[in-house]
Structure formats: C-alpha cells, structure tokens
C-alpha cells in the first residue's frame, strides 16, 4: 500500500479519507502522526491555502499529500468569513463564537439576502515539487438561518440552512450531509480522478 500524508490533525477527516482511499491502495496517515506541524495559511484563497498545506506536508515527509481548505462565504458580507471561517471571531475562537459573530453581522439582513455557500478545495500533490497538483472544488449553496438548529456537524452547520432539504447542515445525518456537502462533492471528484488515473 502506498502511504500518503493527510495535511490535518483532525481524526475525523483522517478516518473518513482512510476508508475511502483504502480501495485505491492508499494508506492515509495524519501529518500529526508523522510529527509535522501545521503549515502557516498565508494564501488569500482556499486553493492557495490547500496547496500550501499539501506542499508543506509533502516536503516535510517526502510522501504524497492531500490537503483541504474550506470555509463559508456569505453573499451579504462580500464572501466573508471565507478563508478566515475558522478564526472569524479571533485566532483562538470557538465554533460557537464564530457562529455568534456571524449572526450578529447578519442581524439586520433580510432572508432574501442571506445566501451563502460552503466551499471545499482538496489538493492531491504527488510530491513537494509537483508542478501540476490535482485540485478539486466543491460548493454547497444554502442560506444563513436566524437561529441555530441541530446538534450534528460542527462549525457553522447549525445556522447553514439547506432549502432543498428543509434542514440545517447540523440536522442532517452524516450520510445525508456527505451526499450533498462541499467536502463530499470535492472528495467525489478526487476519487473519480484517482479511479481514472
């Protein structure tokens, strides 16, 4: 089995990808298991940050790497919080603090202007000097609710309402969410590309 480093310390992401990539003969290992520190996210886009993370992990370990960068873009806020989604309320802010800051920012915004999209960019880098990393983008449209609902998921899921399903992302089962989410879409594109390779 070919070993590949996942540029994250998030055990949930590692587990999910490890199961899906095992069929392709890939053994997914979290960068934290290999003693790799997180890369500094200095890019201005999800794509730039995902490439920075993948390159850092590949450079440090000498292994192929997969990285993701994702976040929420709210129309009424010009795309914010965007690449700053995880630290919208400050560097060490909790999911709840980020969510509350977003609700305050949108408190006077009418329903028809509360459109938003979750974005996920997945990058597969064969080696640190890979001149053509594979880049996959998933986008999930929704609306920012006025109040949180649901206990599943994380981050902004409790206020990300999906009109087509009549629920927030935090009210969906893991299977329902994976079938329609930004990360699920990007992952499907990556798996299709690996299948065709």
UniProtKB/Swiss-Prot annotation:
It catalyses: XTP + H2O = XMP + diphosphate + H(+); dITP + H2O = dIMP + diphosphate + H(+); ITP + H2O = IMP + diphosphate + H(+). This is dITP/XTP pyrophosphatase. Homodimer. Pyrophosphatase that catalyzes the hydrolysis of nucleoside triphosphates to their monophosphate derivatives, with a high preference for the non-canonical purine nucleotides XTP (xanthosine triphosphate), dITP (deoxyinosine triphosphate) and ITP. Seems to function as a house-cleaning enzyme that removes non-canonical purine nucleotides from the nucleotide pool, thus preventing their incorporation into DNA/RNA and avoiding chromosomal lesions. The active site is at residue 69. InterPro entries: dITP/XTP_pyrophosphatase, ITPase-like_fam, RdgB/HAM1. Mg(2+) binds at residues 40, 69. GO terms for molecular function: dITP diphosphatase activity; ITP diphosphatase activity; metal ion binding; nucleoside triphosphate diphosphatase activity; nucleotide binding; ribonucleoside triphosphate phosphatase activity; XTP diphosphatase activity.
């Amino acid at each position: 089995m070919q070993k590949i480093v996942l540029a994250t310390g998030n055990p949930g992401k590692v587990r999910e990808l490890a199961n899906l990539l095992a069929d392709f003969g890939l053994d997914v290992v979290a960068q934290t298991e290999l003693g790799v520190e997180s890369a500094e996210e200095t890019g201005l886009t999800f794509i730039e940050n995902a490439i920075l993370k993948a390159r850092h992990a590949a450079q440090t370990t000498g292994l192929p790497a997969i990285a993701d960068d994702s976040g929420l873009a709210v129309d009424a806020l010009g795309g914010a919080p965007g690449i700053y989604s995880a630290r919208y309320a400050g560097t060490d802010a909790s999911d709840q603090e980020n969510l509350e800051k977003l609700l305050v920012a949108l408190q006077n915004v009418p329903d028809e202007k509360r459109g938003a999209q979750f974005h996920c960019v997945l990058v597969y880098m064969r080696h640190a000097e890979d001149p053509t990393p594979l880049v996959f983008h998933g986008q999930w449209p929704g609306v920012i609710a006025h109040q949180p609902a649901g206990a599943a998921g994380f981050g902004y899921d409790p206020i990300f309402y999906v009109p087509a399903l009549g629920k927030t992302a935090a009210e969906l089962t893991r299977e329902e969410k994976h079938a329609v989410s930004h990360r699920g879409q990007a992952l499907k594109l990556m798996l299709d590309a690996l299948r065709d390779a």
